[in-house]
Amino acid sequence: MRLKDKLGGKVTIISMGPMQTREAIKKAMSFGADRAILLSDRHFGGSDSLATAYILSTALKKVNETEPIDLVLAGKEAIDGDTAQTGPGIAQRLGFPQLTYVIRVREMTESNITVERKTEAGRQVVEAQLPALITVEKELNEVRYASLPDLMKAAQYIPDIWDSNSLIFDATQMGLKGSPTSVSRIFAPLG
């Protein structure tokens, strides 16, 4: 939202999940987003990171038809899989450069973005042309507080709901059919 405050533009939230995800979307809307889209369908269920990247990138392509995208922000990794593959998968499908593990946006112009990212050796400053996708770490920014009017407005907000009939999807690339990986078991490491 701070990038929007500084540079203008619109913020669209796109999330994939069950209908209960609307509550999380409402919270995000209270911080100043302009629009939200929830991708929700039983056919999306069981999607691994590859299938999830396919579904999200298909939605982003549709948004890009009417509202050109400059920057896609994604979380570093999902809490259920910890694979950190969905953001890079989306970038690859969109043909966008990707900057991962971003902890700070140093500068953004109409054509470029410069960020600071975490690496195993420390920190690195990198630049990419826009449009781009960045996966962000928690320390990227402090969450702003929503004002009471924004909270009240967001509580009434109804996101657009897109299902498998809303876009042209290849059924073999989503859900369990489109997921080459599966979890056979989960266990805590010894020690």
Tell where the protein language model's regions lie, with residue ranges:
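N-terminal glycine-rich FAD/FM-binding segment characteristic of electron-transfer flavoproteins
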Residues: 1-191
